[in-house]
Amino acid sequence: MPVDPEKLAKLQKSTAKKVGGSRVKAKKGVKTEQDDTKLIETLGKLKATKIEGVEEANFFKDDGKVLHFNRVGVQGAPAANTFAFTGYPQEKNITQLIPQILPQLGAENLEILRQLAEQIQAGKNPKDFGAAGEAGATEEANEDIPDLVDQKFDDVE
């Protein structure tokens, strides 16, 4: 009976390999549903309770960006000093949220507020505010662009 080497190679690859008499198990991918159930189980062990009345949450990052949770679920276990925030975060600039988050800003964000105030006093648009390095880069890029107000392009050259 002739044996086709291609079919034989395909069969050998498809069968589970044995190492030391036991089969090698294929790794299963971790799904987010499994992560969620593990998180829920862990919060249950800590006796975390749902905290009502939280409409939004903001996490301030070092680079001046804010993780903004519009609809947030909060569970807390004060005995274990553990709190879980669940929802879909949006990364926003601090200037996009400035009227709503002024009461939430602490001492660590005073430098960002100071930079914003300087930009407003200088007449710049605060929407352009990002990190301090980004503001300097846009100023340098705008220096090369000539003002063409009430002039023709051919006259400038």
Swiss-Prot record:
Residues 33-98 form the NAC-A/B domain. GO terms for cellular component: cytoplasm; nucleus. Coiled coil: none annotated. Residues 130-139 have a biased composition (Low complexity). GO terms for biological process: protein transport. It is found in: Cytoplasm; Nucleus. Residues 1-31, 125-157 are annotated as: Disordered. Its main location: cytoplasm. Keywords: Cytoplasm, Nucleus, Protein transport, Repressor, Transcription, Transcription regulation, Transport. InterPro entries: BTF3, NAC_A/B_dom_sf, Nas_poly-pep-assoc_cplx_dom. Pfam families: NAC. PANTHER family: TRANSCRIPTION FACTOR BTF3 FAMILY MEMBER. Component of the nascent polypeptide-associated complex (NAC), a dynamic component of the ribosomal exit tunnel, protecting the emerging polypeptides from interaction with other cytoplasmic proteins to ensure appropriate nascent protein targeting. The NAC complex also promotes mitochondrial protein import by enhancing productive ribosome interactions with the outer mitochondrial membrane and blocks the inappropriate interaction of ribosomes translating non-secretory nascent polypeptides with translocation sites in the membrane of the endoplasmic reticulum. Part of the nascent polypeptide-associated complex (NAC), consisting of EGD2 and EGD1. NAC associates with ribosomes via EGD1. Belongs to the NAC-beta family. This is Nascent polypeptide-associated complex subunit beta. It comes from Lodderomyces elongisporus (strain ATCC 11503 / CBS 2605 / JCM 1781 / NBRC 1676 / NRRL YB-4239) (Yeast). The gene is EGD1.
